Amino acid sequence: MAKDYYKILGVDRNATDEEIKKAFRELAKKWHPDLHPENKQEAEEKFKEISEAYEVLSDPQKRRMYDQTGTVDFGAGGQNFNWDNFTHYSDLNDIFNDIFGGNFASDFFSGFGRGQREEQYDLDLYTNLDITLEDAYYGTEKRIKYRRNAMCPDCNGTGAKNGKLITCPTCNGTGQQRIVRGQGFFRMVTVTTCQTCGGRGRIPEEKCPRCNGTGTVVVNEDISVKIPKGATDNLRLRVQGKGQSYNGRTGDLYVVLRVRNDRNVQRINDDLMIDQKINFAQAALGDTIEVNLFREKYSLKIPEGTQPGEVLRIKGAGMPHLNGHGSGDLLVRVNVEVPKRLTQKQKDLIREIFDIKENHRSWFH
């Protein structure tokens, strides 16, 4: 006989989602098994029935199927509900917090066979590498020396002599240990990685003499890392398979670049800026000069009437675009040098050019 989920929760067939949730919360608090030690079995059945009804009526698709056919498909379980079908853990967690305090939902369902995943280890390594702006401009290769746990070459990371493994007697091959606290229906179950086998479920029948059963050996690495043109500060370079090894797996090495500032060159995204001195005549009359950037030389035209602090641009002479084509621009900020000492003839010529009267002689002393 089909169950009447609306009757179980005590709501009308046109009940809103909020009304269904409210009814479930009240009934779940009322029938929690640990609150009924005198008739715990009845409370367990009632609590499960309430949860089943809520699972169906709080899900639009399941509720629509139930309203149309009077039945619900719970997946692998068919029409039979079990705790693996329940998906509203956050709602139960709120209820448990009201009753007991703390975060109990995940531990509560562990008592019904919902185990936790095997503990995962971060096998990746990270290291910083300082480079110059010139290194980033041209691209280069740098050597890095470090130590890591590598897979034992004698046992291929199994930790077993001759590679022979047996089932772990502590966890019976599950890779996990379950610690149960409390009694009765409401049990606190903590699932941890097995300390004997490290979560593998198997242990060496006889330990590898080289690695003493760990599956790894410490090695000193000396590797070359390619720095791409256009490298930026905090850029992460991945060196595959050069991280830590554990349980037959090996992580990666991540090299984090630190691009040092250059006293003569300023980076603005992919544009580079330098300061260039020119004399008064070049600024006034114009000229073509040579500017230097690292190991490169570029020709730059100084227009007539160039002002101090004016920025001139050499297209495509800046920082190469990272992982792309082309480059930024080279920005040349012009600094006009004013001579500190002039001959009398030079002073007279300047006065004549700018029609400066004799009473302004102090300008040139």
Swiss-Prot record:
Its cofactor is Zn(2+). One of its GO terms (cellular component) is cytoplasm. A zinc finger (CR-type) spans 139-220. Residues 4-70 form the J domain. Zn(2+) 2 binds at residues 168, 171, 194, 197. Keywords: Chaperone, Cytoplasm, DNA replication, Metal-binding, Repeat, Stress response, Zinc, Zinc-finger. It comes from the Archaea. GO terms for molecular function: ATP binding; heat shock protein binding; unfolded protein binding; zinc ion binding. One of its GO terms (biological process) is DNA replication. Signal peptide: none annotated. Zn(2+) 1 binds at residues 152, 155, 208, 211. CXXCXGXG motif repeats lie at residues 152-159, 168-175, 194-201, 208-215. Pfam families: DnaJ, DnaJ_C, DnaJ_CXXCXGXG. Binds 2 Zn(2+) ions per monomer. Belongs to the DnaJ family. Participates actively in the response to hyperosmotic and heat shock by preventing the aggregation of stress-denatured proteins and by disaggregating proteins, also in an autonomous, DnaK-independent fashion. Unfolded proteins bind initially to DnaJ; upon interaction with the DnaJ-bound protein, DnaK hydrolyzes its bound ATP, resulting in the formation of a stable complex. GrpE releases ADP from DnaK; ATP binding to DnaK triggers the release of the substrate protein, thus completing the reaction cycle. Homodimer. The J domain is necessary and sufficient to stimulate DnaK ATPase activity. Zinc center 1 plays an important role in the autonomous, DnaK-independent chaperone activity of DnaJ. Zinc center 2 is essential for interaction with DnaK and for DnaJ activity. This is Chaperone protein DnaJ. It comes from Thermoplasma acidophilum (strain ATCC 25905 / DSM 1728 / JCM 9062 / NBRC 15155 / AMRC-C165). The lineage of its organism: Archaea, Methanobacteriati, Thermoplasmatota, Thermoplasmata, Thermoplasmatales.
